[in-house]
A protein has these predicted regions:
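Generic hydrophobic/packing signal
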Residues: 3, 24-27, 136
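Short, flexible active-site-adjacent loop segments at beta-strand->alpha-helix junctions, enriched
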Residues: 4, 32-34, 90
Length: 138
């Protein structure tokens, strides 16, 4: 589901209907930075961390599929400041960017973490995430 926003939901639901056995279920899961924390919202923007879903969002699904259950929860990942740079380098925006954009992103993240927020090099940070999961059944 982390890629659900890249597919046509109508076509994807049709294909799921074709490949999922009768009585089978599909689970769509989003793990996103919890941008309800202002510093995380800015971090997500600097890192170009993709879609920001509003709390309570529902993914687009089409017949014969329907959402029968939801799980919404939060969790924390502990990362050192350098690991946030490593995480940024996994984002699609970073991967498709050239050296000049990557250099600017790296400097922006360095500035934000160390100058603006005054975190120390190597400091362990609690990064809040939000997980939204949806069970689809026919």
């Amino acid at each position: 589901a982390q890629t659900w926003h890249w597919v046509d939901a109508t076509d994807a639901c049709r294909e799921l209907d074709r490949v999922v056995r009768p009585g089978g279920r599909v689970v769509l899961v989003w793990n996103n930075l919890d941008v309800s924390h202002p510093w995380i919202l800015r971090l997500a923007r600097i890192m170009h961390s993709g879609d920001i879903q509003r709390p309570g969002f529902l993914p687009e699904v089409h017949a014969p599929w329907r959402i029968t259950r939801e799980l919404r929860t939060g969790w924390v990942q502990h990362l050192r400041t350098q690991q946030l740079h490593d995480l940024m380098a996994t984002r699609s925006y970073w991967l498709k960017s050239g050296p000049a954009v990557r250099e600017r992103m790296t400097e922006n993240l360095r500035w934000y973490l160390h100058d603006r927020l005054e975190f120390h090099e190597g400091q362990l940070l609690a990064i809040p995430y939000r997980t939204d999961a949806f069970v689809l059944e026919r």
